[in-house]
């Protein structure tokens, strides 16, 4: 029975321009973030450089968005909204309280800095859709909320921590991959659903877990992102073996920007190497749970073309989890237990530093 009490879940994602007119704003927000664009410059110079880069990159990025067929924008906000709707249904089925689920973005719109998104507490819960901790995603989100409300939300009862190391996430991801290869997923629920499957037994192909790359300077500051990706992949691969998978398992990093050293190997390097060996290749977006430009265009088009150019025998893009029912139920369970307060600083443990208003700072 649902009571009159209403609780709010705010589903947070990185963001993406909904229309071409929002591209430069999105890029400006992205490159203005000190946890993303963290060059050792005075603040006024860093922000000026961020605006310059956003303006310079906008035309090139616009071409990529136009190629996806979503009106020149990104489908990420809409895909996140689908997940929000599914989560709202799941929470209201499971809970005696009424849940209202909103979508907020760290970059672009709807902007999580807006007044409609309230202070984290047991009645207003924030769930960032980042499986693995990184300074550039989770710590950035926490810093935005800290700036807005004057305290870090970790330990407030209104924050759901990253979930990529949870064994249940591993088993759900493995079953999703298995159901994809055995044609059990509803095609109409996934954007640009890959119709072509590898012309080999899926259990023997080379499976590349592609994560979004980060600059190595973040790793050197204490970011344990690479470790988290590796543990996520190991957990999923172990679960996949229960479905008979015996192929190659590889980890790589995509979406590098600029000349600085980033996490390696790059997915371009990995696919080139495997394709030259004549391998059957599948790519799974380990750090993404919502399809967008990096999964649809970068993985689905650029990496596919690279595979053929380098002599690969077949290529397939595995979709992101999206509204996969088991995943939505998994998230709902996390949300319902968010009032079990965290009793330590995950920012320092996973990202190398505490925020200024951390309630667990020594």
UniProtKB/Swiss-Prot annotation:
PROSITE patterns: FERROCHELATASE
Subcellular localization: Cytoplasm
Record-stated family: Belongs to the ferrochelatase family.
Reactions listed under catalytic activity: heme b + 2 H(+) = protoporphyrin IX + Fe(2+)
Keywords: Cytoplasm, Heme biosynthesis, Iron, Lyase, Metal-binding, Porphyrin biosynthesis
CDD domains: Ferrochelatase_C (cd00419), Ferrochelatase_N (cd03411)
Pathway named in the protein's UniProt entry: Porphyrin-containing compound metabolism; protoheme biosynthesis; protoheme from protoporphyrin-IX: step 1/1
UniProt protein name: Ferrochelatase
PANTHER family: FERROCHELATASE, FERROCHELATASE, MITOCHONDRIAL
Entry's EC annotation: 4.98.1.1
Membrane-spanning residues: none
GO MF assignments: ferrochelatase activity; metal ion binding
Gene Ontology cellular-component terms listed: cytoplasm
Binding-site positions, Fe cation: 212, 294
Naturally occurring in which organism (per UniProt): Leptospira biflexa
Superkingdom: Bacteria
InterPro entries: Ferrochelatase, Ferrochelatase_AS, Ferrochelatase_C, Ferrochelatase_N
Main function: Catalyzes the ferrous insertion into protoporphyrin IX.
Classification via NCBIfam families: hemH
Gene3D superfamilies to which the protein is assigned, alphabetical: 3.40.50.1400
Biological processes, Gene Ontology terms: heme biosynthetic process
């Amino acid at each position: 029975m649902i009571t009159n009490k209403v609780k709010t879940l705010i589903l947070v994602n990185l963001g993406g321009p909904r229309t071409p007119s929002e591209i430069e704003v999105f890029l400006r927000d992205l490159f203005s973030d000190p946890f993303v664009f963290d060059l050792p410059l005075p603040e006024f110079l860093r922000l000026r450089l961020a605006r310059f880069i956003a303006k310079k990159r906008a035309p090139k990025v616009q071409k990529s968005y136009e190629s996806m067929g979503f009106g020149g924008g990104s489908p990420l906000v809409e895909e996140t909204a689908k997940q929000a709707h599914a989560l709202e249904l799941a929470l209201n089925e499971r809970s005696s309280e009424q849940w209202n689920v909103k979508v907020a973005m760290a970059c672009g719109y709807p902007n999580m800095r807006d007044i409609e998104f309230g202070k984290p507490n047991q009645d207003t819960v924030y769930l960032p859709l980042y499986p693995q901790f990184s300074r550039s995603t989770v710590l950035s989100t926490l810093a935005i909320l800290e700036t807005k409300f004057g305290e870090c939300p970790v330990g407030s009862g209104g924050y759901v921590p990253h979930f990529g190391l949870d064994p249940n996430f591993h088993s759900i991801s493995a079953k999703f991959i298995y159901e994809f290869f055995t044609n059990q997923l509803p095609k109409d629920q996934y954007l640009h659903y890959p119709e072509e499957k590898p012309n080999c037994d899926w259990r023997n192909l080379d499976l590349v877990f592609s994560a979004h790359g980060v600059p190595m300077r973040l790793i050197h500051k204490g970011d344990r992102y690479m470790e988290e990706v590796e543990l996520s992949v190991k957990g999923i691969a172990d679960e996949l073996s229960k479905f008979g998978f015996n192929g190659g398992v590889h980890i790589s990093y995509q979406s590098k920007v600029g000349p600085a050293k980033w996490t390696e190997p790059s997915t371009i390097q990995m696919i080139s190497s495997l394709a030259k060996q004549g391998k059957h290749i599948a790519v799974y977006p380990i750090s993404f749970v919502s399809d967008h430009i990096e999964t649809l265009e970068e993985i689905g088009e650029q990496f596919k073309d690279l595979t053929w150019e380098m002599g690969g025998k077949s290529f397939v893009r595995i979709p992101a989890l999206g509204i996969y029912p088991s995943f939505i139920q998994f998230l709902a369970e996390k949300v319902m237990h968010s009032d079990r307060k965290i009793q330590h600083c995950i920012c320092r443990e996973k990202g190398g530093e505490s925020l200024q208003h951390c309630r667990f700072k020594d």
